[in-house]
């Protein structure tokens, strides 16, 4: 506190400090003016006042002055006091305006008298632009903006700039003269309608409303001139169209009068000089014209629908594509069949030439075996069905197994095993067997393997059928029932009735042989012939000798057939052989022989087909009959005459390791030796 009081005491009195004007802003950038302002001050100013730190206001003033320099603002006029922040008084402002208008009038009158009208370059620059020198239009504002400075405002000063680029000056002069000729006015300045509405300078706010009126007047003038120009263009277009067609006529007549050499020269010239789209259009038009009138009419319709794409080469491609699609027709000649018209088509019948061959799997015998079995005996079957209705196979729950097994056996058969008698009663399968035989003969290396595979499948089906036949005996063995019926009714039947029953027995025996082969151990289809031939050959003796067999023996054989379906045919053949002996020797021998053959056949379950010559010639099929096809590889190369002479040790050396298989083979060998086939 004492120091502060001492400082106040030592400070000079306020009366000694002279009064100076209050400065609201920091001193300007100009150092000379700053020195003058400090020189005017008395010497009693404290030291260090001139070198004081620049304040924030001083920095703002510096930025403001640089901004005014960039915006071309005249803030440094000579009439202003540098240290004075307030605007000048009214007298100074009026004097400066009078001096500016006098100088402007003098310069404009001098320029108009000395130079032509088109050489004057108007400008929109503010009066402050004069301080930047004579190169404002070319250097500072640039060449592109110097042409936009024209204005017919009488208040704005018209200054004369000496541009560096003389070519740009001549271009501006030409633009002024052309604008003058178009607008029809005598003013040497550019029209305001072609200029953008450019904002005025900062200090020039005078006569802005009059300028808008002038722009509206010039716009109305240009609109009226545009309407008149449009009318004249329409008239010229009509004249040009008439001239165009007349020129086309003259050009076509000129082409017609040219010689061939000149025509070639003209075409070469046009092809080398015309644009590509015109050449493509001409090519498409020429192709459509050469194709005919219908295509040309379609082309004209499409060109009327799409007039904007006429000259486009892509539209021509599209039109060609559409034309080709329109030509596509279902009844086109290129898609018709090449077969000639047949006489069957006129009668709406199936044409046998065009008919596709039916597949072999669609054979009626495969799905309906009754058709193939009875087509030769249809009359006898019909007469017998009226008295004794047959049991239909379709009632059996395993009816599909018969068809499957029969089909697999037919596929396993080769060409050597196709018999004529079998095809006689199965004509629907004769073509199938022959075609399969041809295929097997062409493929001899894999024939046996295919037979084994198909036979194995047939074995599975036959075993299932055997189990089903044990459950349904009345369905499985219809032949035995029919034989019993014929045996019981043979005593009272008249001769003509016996003849009818003989035909029915032929059918029943054949059906029995089919069932026997289907339910056995995969017997190939060739065995049907031997089965039927044996049964058919013995039927002649049945007519005379079946009356001597009593009903008790028939009942016994019927039970054995049910229990053992595999021995059904052998029992039947034994009975028929007994009948043949009873016709010559008497009834006593018949009873003895019947019991002997019955006991012998019942003791051995070996099928009688093992002695068939055709099976013996085909060892794989013979082994399949015995259900020993697993030893096919061991025994297939041994002839049957040597095979039946083998003993137990030789079979074991051949590869038959199972004792049961060797015993079964030895039994089969004995059967073959007892019933040697006739070679």
Curated annotation (Swiss-Prot):
Gene Ontology terms describing biological process: nuclear-transcribed mRNA poly(A) tail shortening; protein transport; single-species biofilm formation
Keyword vocabulary terms for this entry: Cytoplasm, Nucleotide-binding, Protein transport, RNA-binding, Transport
Chain intervals with Low complexity compositional bias: 90-100, 214-239, 530-554, 574-604
Sequence segments annotated as region (Disordered): 1-50, 79-100, 179-239, 469-502, 516-604
Residue stretches making up the SAM domain: 614-675
Organism domain of life: Eukaryota
GO terms under cellular component: cytosol; P-body
Gene3D superfamilies according to UniProt: Transcription Factor, Ets-1 (1.10.150.50)
Classification via InterPro entries: SAM, SAM/pointed_sf, SMAUG/VTS1_RNA-bind, VTS1_SAM
GO molecular function: mRNA binding; nucleotide binding
Pfam families for this protein: SAM_2
Bias (Polar residues) ranges: 1-17, 30-50, 79-89, 179-213, 563-573
Compartments (UniProt record): Cytoplasm, Cytosol; Cytoplasm, P-body
Major place of residence: cytoplasm
Cross-referenced PROSITE patterns: SAM_DOMAIN
Function: RNA-binding protein involved in post-transcriptional regulation through transcript degradation.
Quaternary structure and partners: Monomer. Binds to RNA.
Family: Belongs to the VTS1 family.
Record PANTHER family: PROTEIN SMAUG, STERILE ALPHA MOTIF DOMAIN CONTAINING PROTEIN 4-RELATED
Protein name: RNA-binding protein VTS1
Source organism (scientific name): Candida albicans (strain SC5314 / ATCC MYA-2876) (Yeast)
């Amino acid at each position: 506190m004492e120091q502060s009081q001492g400082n106040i005491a030592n400070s000079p009195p306020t009366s000694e400090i002279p009064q100076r004007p209050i400065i609201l802003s920091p001193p300007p950038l100009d150092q000379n003016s700053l020195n003058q302002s400090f020189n005017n001050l008395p010497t009693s100013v404290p030291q260090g006042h001139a070198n004081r730190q620049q304040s924030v206001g001083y920095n703002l003033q510096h930025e403001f002055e640089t901004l005014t320099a960039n915006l071309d603002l005249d803030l440094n006029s000579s009439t202003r006091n540098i240290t004075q922040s307030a605007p000048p008084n009214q007298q100074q402002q009026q004097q400066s305006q009078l001096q500016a208008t006098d100088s402007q009038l003098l310069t404009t009158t001098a320029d108009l008298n000395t130079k032509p009208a088109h050489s004057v370059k108007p400008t929109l620059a503010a009066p402050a632009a004069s301080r930047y020198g004579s190169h404002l239009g070319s250097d500072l504002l640039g060449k592109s903006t110097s042409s936009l400075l024209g204005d017919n405002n009488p208040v704005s000063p018209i200054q004369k700039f000496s541009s560096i680029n003389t070519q740009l000056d001549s271009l501006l002069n030409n633009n002024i003269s052309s604008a003058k000729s178009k607008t029809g006015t005598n003013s040497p300045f550019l029209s305001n309608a072609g200029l953008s509405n450019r904002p005025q300078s900062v200090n020039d706010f005078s006569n802005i409303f009059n300028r808008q009126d002038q722009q509206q007047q010039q716009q109305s003038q240009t609109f009226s001139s545009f309407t008149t120009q449009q009318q004249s263009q329409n008239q010229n277009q009509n004249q040009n169209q008439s001239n165009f067609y007349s020129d086309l006529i003259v050009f076509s007549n000129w082409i017609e009068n040219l010689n061939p050499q000149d025509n070639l020269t003209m075409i070469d010239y046009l092809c080398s000089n015309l644009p590509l789209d015109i050449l493509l259009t001409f090519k498409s038009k020429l192709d459509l014209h050469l194709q005919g009138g219908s295509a040309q009419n379609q082309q004209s319709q499409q060109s009327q629908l799409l007039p904007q794409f006429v000259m486009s080469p892509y539209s021509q491609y599209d039109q060609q594509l559409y034309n080709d699609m329109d030509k596509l027709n279902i009844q086109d000649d290129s898609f018709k069949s090449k077969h000639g018209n047949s006489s069957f088509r006129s009668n709406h019948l199936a044409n046998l030439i065009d008919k596709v061959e039916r597949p072999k799997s669609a054979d009626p015998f495969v799905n309906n075996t009754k058709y193939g079995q009875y087509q030769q005996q249809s009359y006898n079957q019909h007469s017998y069905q009226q008295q004794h209705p047959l049991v239909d196979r379709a009632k059996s729950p395993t009816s599909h197994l018969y068809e499957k097994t029969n089909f697999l056996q037919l596929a396993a058969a080769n060409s050597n095993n196709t018999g004529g008698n079998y095809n006689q009663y199965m004509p629907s399968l004769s073509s199938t067997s022959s075609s399969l035989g041809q295929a097997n003969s062409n493929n001899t290396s894999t024939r046996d393997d295919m037979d084994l595979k198909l036979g194995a499948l047939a074995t599975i089906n036959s075993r299932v059928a055997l189990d089903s036949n044990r459950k349904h005996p009345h369905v499985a063995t219809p032949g035995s029932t029919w034989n019993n019926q014929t045996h019981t009714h043979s005593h009272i039947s008249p001769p003509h009735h016996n003849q009818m029953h003989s035909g029915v027995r032929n059918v029943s025996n054949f059906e029995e042989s089919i069932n026997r082969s289907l339910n056995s151990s995969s017997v190939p289809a060739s065995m049907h012939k031997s089965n039927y031939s044996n049964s058919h050959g013995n039927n002649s003796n049945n007519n005379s000798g079946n009356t001597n067999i009593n009903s008790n023996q028939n009942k016994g054989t019927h039970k054995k057939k049910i229990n053992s379906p595999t021995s059904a045919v052998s029992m039947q053949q034994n009975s028929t052989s007994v009948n043949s002996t009873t016709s010559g020797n008497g009834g006593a021998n018949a009873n003895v022989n019947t019991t002997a053959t019955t006991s012998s056949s019942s003791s051995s379950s070996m099928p009688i087909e093992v002695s068939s010559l055709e099976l013996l010639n085909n060892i794989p099929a013979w082994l399949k009959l015995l259900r020993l096809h697993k030893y096919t590889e061991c025994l297939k190369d041994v002839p049957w005459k040597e095979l039946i002479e083998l003993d137990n040790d030789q079979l074991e050396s051949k590869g038959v390791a199972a004792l049961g298989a060797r015993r079964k083979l030895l039994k089969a060998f004995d059967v073959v030796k007892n019933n040697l086939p006739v070679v």
